[in-house]
Regions:
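Functional transmembrane or membrane-interface alpha-helices that line membrane-embedded catalytic
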Residues: 170-187, 296-318
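Acidic, carboxylate-rich catalytic segments that either coordinate divalent cations
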Residues: 350-402
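Primarily interfacial, aromatic-capped hydrophobic alpha-helices that serve as membrane anchors
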Residues: 186-215, 311-356
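Alpha-helical membrane-embedding segments
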Residues: 285, 308-314, 379-381
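All-alpha helical catalytic cores of prenyl diphosphate-utilizing isoprenoid enzymes
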Residues: 84-153, 159-175, 181-294, 360
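Hydrophobic core of alpha-helical transmembrane segments in multi-pass integral membrane proteins
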Residues: 73-80, 181, 322, 351
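Alpha-helical transmembrane segments of multi-pass membrane proteins
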Residues: 249-253, 278, 339-348, 352, ...
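Conserved N-terminal diphosphate/IPP-binding helix and adjacent helical/loop segment
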Residues: 1-148, 156, 218-237, 392-402
């Protein structure tokens, strides 16, 4: 049973969070001139990559992404923006994440040709987390049936539970059937959408036999229990202790399931890091979604923060907590551990910084400046680079479908 192990790790994570209470925010400071020069250098590199893709890849109905990955212009952009050596990173890996990405998109489009891009990307985000876990475990990077199935359960179940035409009772009945399928009970399938979900569970069963890998299904049931709780309307405000535990359990359970569906079993070292990593991702999501959550009265640590001081304290604690989590990362060798730590550190930094920029009205100007000064390009220049990417991607998508 993983429940006891899970509870112990959540308790330890909560103590780690409490340990961040009085820590001050310390950031490396880049001068505005340095940030401007870095921004211009990255922008120039980004424009070269955009031109490269537009001239050599856009007209191809099946572009070779592995060839694109090897282009010197793209490698230079990654090196400048993410401050890491893509060649050294790739040399430490087995397999290829680009091929895993292509395989996933192909499988989705083959089975659900009308699925919106937003839902595909939602599932793809989880595939990338599982690919990162394959890297940590020293396994060959490849899309497995379990990775495909578990990642697709996100949009498939969300679509059903978000359907305005279904009553709360119907959604509750579906959750009961889903719980039965996860336990191996052959509950009746009522709709085509439910059939798709059931088939995903069967794919997982095909890779991980229940008798040999019981903890895989226990981890899936942890997520399911959180989903059932979410159907209950939030009424009385939760106290801080309750809110913290619910948040930590929700984030940790998702990534722990990722780990089990990659490895079948988890060492204590892996279980601990994936618990912490899941919590960081959940807190970062809550930070990003705080306005929307507050609008619909969805309680999270960040949607309940009512002033600059509270927002800044929570964000500073998240920054320190994410750094403490990364210390626990596991990998088969020191070289790969270094590269993975650098990659996740940069991605966490971007996630948190982007959210601070989005919700800058909830922070004091001083705090915003401190955060911005610690980013190589500064927050506003970083946002400009992201805008260039968004606009260009939308343009490519329009041309692709025309």
């Amino acid at each position: 049973m993983i429940t006891e192990r899970f509870t112990l790790n959540i308790d330890e994570a909560i103590q780690m969070w409490h340990d961040t209470a009085n820590l001050r925010l310390k950031r490396h400071k880049y001068s505005r001139l340095k940030q401007l020069l870095t921004y211009l250098k990255i922008k120039r590199s980004l424009k070269k990559v955009i031109t490269l893709i537009s001239e050599n890849y856009l007209g191809d109905p099946s572009p070779n992404l592995n060839r694109l990955k090897a282009e010197p212009q793209l490698r230079q952009l990654i090196s400048l923006w993410f401050e890491m050596d893509p060649l050294a990173f790739e040399s430490a890996l087995k397999g290829d994440f680009v091929t895993a990405t292509e395989d996933f998109i192909h499988r989705v489009k083959t089975k659900w040709p009308q699925m919106p891009h937003e839902e595909i990307f939602q599932a793809l985000r989880n595939v990338w987390i599982m690919v990162a876990i394959q890297m940590m475990a020293g396994r060959e990077i490849m899309l497995t049936d379990a990775m495909f199935a578990y990642s697709m359960l996100y949009p498939l179940t969300d679509n059903l539970l978000d359907d305005a035409n279904l009553s709360r009772e119907e959604k509750g009945a579906f959750c009961n059937r889903l719980g039965g399928w996860l336990r191996g009970i052959p509950e009746k399938v009522n709709t085509e959408r439910e059939q798709d979900i059931y088939e995903m569970i069967q794919l997982i069963e095909g890779q991980f036999a229940r008798s040999k890998f019981p903890e895989v299904y226990e981890s899936l049931l942890l997520i399911h229990e959180a989903q059932v709780k979410s159907l209950s309307p939030q009424q009385a405000p939760l106290n801080d202790t309750e809110m913290l535990r619910i948040t930590f359990e929700k984030g940790a359970s998702s990534v722990i399931a990722d780990g089990y569906l990659v490895m079948g079993n988890l060492t204590d070292e892996a279980f601990t890091f994936l618990t912490l990593y899941g919590i960081v991702l959940q807190l970062a999501d809550d930070l990003q979604d705080q306005s929307e959550d507050a609008t619909v009265n969805h309680q999270t640590l960040f949607s309940r923060s009512s002033n600059f001081e509270t927002s800044e304290q929570l964000t500073t604690r998240l920054i320190h907590f994410s750094k403490a989590a990364l210390i626990k990362i596991f990998a088969p060798n020191e070289a790969l551990k270094h590269h993975l730590t650098k990659l996740l550190e940069k991605s966490m930094d971007f996630l948190i910084s982007d959210a601070i920029h989005t919700h800058r009205d909830t922070y004091s100007s001083h705090y915003y400046r401190v955060i911005s000064s610690g980013l190589k390009t500064g927050l506003r220049y970083h946002e400009r680079l992201k805008t260039i990417c968004r606009v260009q991607t939308a343009h490519w998508a329009e041309k692709w479908h025309s």
